[in-house]
Amino acid sequence: MNKVVVKNVTFGEGAPKICVPMVGKTVAALKEEAEMLKTIDLDVVEWRVDFFEDVKDLVKVKAALDEIRAILPETPILFTFRSAKEGGELAVSDEFYFELNETLAGTGKIDLVDVELFNEEADVLRLIETAHKNNVKVVMSNHDFDKTPAKEEIVSRLTRMEALGADLPKIAVMPKSAGDVLTLLDATNTVSEKANQPIITMSMAGTGVISRLAGEVFGSAMTFGAAKKASAPGQIDVNELRHVLDLLHKQF
């Protein structure tokens, strides 16, 4: 499997990397969050820009990113606009979604960009090309907040993401039962054994919490923890998360 190196973080080796989302609505709130995250043991910061009140103003988005980067100069930043259809805060046109992501990928200030799988393939490929030209890694994602698809479907989506050029394919699904969590873990194990790229998977909510902890066992390269406000159901406090990941890593 290829390792994916972003600044001082290597995905695809050792314990899953910890990503903590920033969900501030204003520049002031984001700066406060960034200062707080500076004190926390994490690997990646995800800027969930769909929470930002001025997200439709690209000049203001870039200015906010400058402020975040000034506070976190060495921390890998994952830039994510989560669309409403995948559980995000805001519905925007496809045209704006791609303009936003392509513009920010070209700033030199982000390290990874989230690209949702279920869009026009030509648009997705263009965004991947723009990202890679600017040395930005692509987290290609899909989120199902209603259910856990069949194992074959989870495997198919992750495999498709890699085929399109994702550096880090990602899927998050909602369990209705413990069996659904096993389905996600089984799919993760199957894909990680044959994939060329590290993958990121999770089963959400309380039922799925084991999937956020057991990535090193089943093959998920990153997990999401909460420092203040969780951006998705089931995220664990980042300090507790590091403790458990370290505990499991020592057994390997």
Curated annotation (Swiss-Prot):
Q: Where does 3-dehydroquinate bind?
A: 46-48, 82, 212, 231, 235
Annotated EC: 4.2.1.10
**Entry keywords, A to Z:** Amino-acid biosynthesis, Aromatic amino acid biosynthesis, Lyase, Schiff base
Instruction: Output one GO BP term.
Output: aromatic amino acid family biosynthetic process
Q: What pathway is it annotated to?
A: Metabolic intermediate biosynthesis; chorismate biosynthesis; chorismate from D-erythrose 4-phosphate and phosphoenolpyruvate: step 3/7
InterPro entries attached here? 3-dehydroquinate_DH_AS, Aldolase_TIM, DHquinase_I, Type-I_3-dehydroquinase
Q: Which residues form the active site?
A: 143 (proton donor/acceptor), 170 (schiff-base intermediate with substrate)
Name of the top EC class for this enzyme: lyase
Q: Which Pfam families match?
A: DHquinase_I
GO molecular function terms listed in the Swiss-Prot or TrEMBL record = 3-dehydroquinate dehydratase activity
Please give the catalytic activity noted in the UniProt record.
3-dehydroquinate = 3-dehydroshikimate + H2O
Q: Which family does it belong to?
A: Belongs to the type-I 3-dehydroquinase family.
**Subunit text:** Homodimer.
Cited function: Involved in the third step of the chorismate pathway, which leads to the biosynthesis of aromatic amino acids. Catalyzes the cis-dehydration of 3-dehydroquinate (DHQ) and introduces the first double bond of the aromatic ring to yield 3-dehydroshikimate.
| Entry protein name | 3-dehydroquinate dehydratase
> Which species does the entry assign this protein to?
Listeria innocua serovar 6a (strain ATCC BAA-680 / CLIP 11262)
